[in-house]
């Protein structure tokens, strides 16, 4: 079925394709695979492990001449995790560039994605939008390939330009007889614009941001913190949020620093908790949220001081290309009840 759909697309999308002419200079065949499936498939949430549209480009590395480009605005009848192409190329080192999920009405690029974009234009693109869903996650892949034989095979792994926060809430074992109800989880300073090249780690200016909430009508009663964490999987998260990378340059939080605000009832008494998404031992990118990373946030209401204890663990979507760049460790930090003053989060 997948091959049949691809055959239909080749026919229907030919007007958006810049083919390679069969000249004597084109002495090699390049077979490449676009792959979006994460190393750990357990990290997939909904459709964020697949794509529904794809823009492809092949450039000469030396002079950045585009030898091939193709826009596939829609894959039907189903989304894909992998896509392959085989094209004739000249015997020069190539740069393959791919953008997945580009054809989304909520995305606005600084320059419209078209078959005739240069490599420089692609690497300087910025993108903005108003909202995220699991089905519109922007992914970009870039791969340098040496054409050193008549038949060359390459794989282009895709990086997600977002971070995802999965928030799981529980109550301490000591609160078994207490009623703990969560009314809302708010993610403050969700970033809505980014540089589309994963290699550009700065943030565009001005920064576009907003606050988003998961509201539980009637409240959600918290269960006890389980000893078996096998059920801690994305589909069981109380809330999941996406954001473009949020780089906080200093060890001191600023107005753009991301944090969460949780409203809960403890035996009928209302509390609001606020805290940054970091841990006590973290020094590099202490307050940042990095692209291509899933953050597992375990939040537990504790007794007797009504503390909210949080354990945050970042997982690279792709182990070889995450911005984390270090071994992952789990550290606890605590959030104190929020007193209404936004000046000081802990």
Annotated model-derived regions:
Residues 14-17:
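Bacterial signal peptide processing site
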Residues 40-111, 164, 173-291, 342-346:
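Tryptophan-paired
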């Amino acid at each position: 079925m997948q091959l049949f759909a691809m055959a239909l697309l080749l026919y229907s999308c030919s007007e958006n394709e810049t083919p390679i002419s069969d000249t004597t200079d084109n002495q090699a065949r390049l077979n490449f695979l676009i792959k979006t499936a994460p190393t750990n498939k357990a990290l997939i949430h909904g459709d964020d492990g697949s794509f529904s549209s794809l823009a492809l480009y092949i450039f000469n590395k030396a002079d950045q001449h585009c030898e091939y480009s193709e826009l596939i605005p829609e894959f039907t009848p189903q989304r894909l995790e992998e896509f392959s192409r085989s094209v004739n190329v000249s015997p020069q080192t190539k740069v393959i560039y791919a953008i997945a999920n580009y054809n989304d009405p909520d995305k606005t690029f600084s320059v419209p994605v078209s078959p005739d974009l240069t490599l420089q234009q692609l690497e300087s693109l910025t993108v903005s939008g108003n909202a995220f869903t699991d089905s519109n996650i922007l992914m970009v892949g870039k791969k340098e390939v040496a054409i050193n034989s008549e038949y060359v095979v390459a794989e282009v792994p895709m990086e997600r330009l977002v971070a995802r926060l999965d928030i799981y809430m529980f109550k301490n074992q000591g609160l078994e007889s207490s009623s703990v109800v969560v009314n809302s989880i708010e993610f403050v300073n969700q970033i809505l614009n980014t540089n589309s090249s994963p290699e550009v780690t700065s943030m565009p200016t001005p920064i576009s941001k907003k606050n988003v909430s998961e509201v539980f009508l009637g409240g959600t009663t918290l269960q006890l913190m389980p000893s078996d964490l096998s059920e801690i999987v994305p589909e069981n998260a109380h809330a999941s949020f996406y954001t473009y990378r949020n780089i906080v340059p200093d060890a001191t939080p600023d107005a753009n620093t991301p944090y969460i605000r949780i409203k809960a009832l403890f035996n009928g008494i209302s509390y609001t908790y606020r805290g940054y998404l970091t841990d006590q031992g973290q020094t590099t990118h202490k307050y940042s949220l990095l692209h291509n990373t899933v953050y597992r946030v375990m939040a537990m209401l504790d007794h007797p001081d009504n503390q909210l204890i949080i354990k945050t663990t970042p997982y690279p979507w792709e182990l070889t290309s995450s911005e984390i760049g270090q071994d992952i460790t789990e550290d606890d930090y605590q959030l104190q009840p929020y007193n209404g003053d936004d000046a000081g989060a802990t």
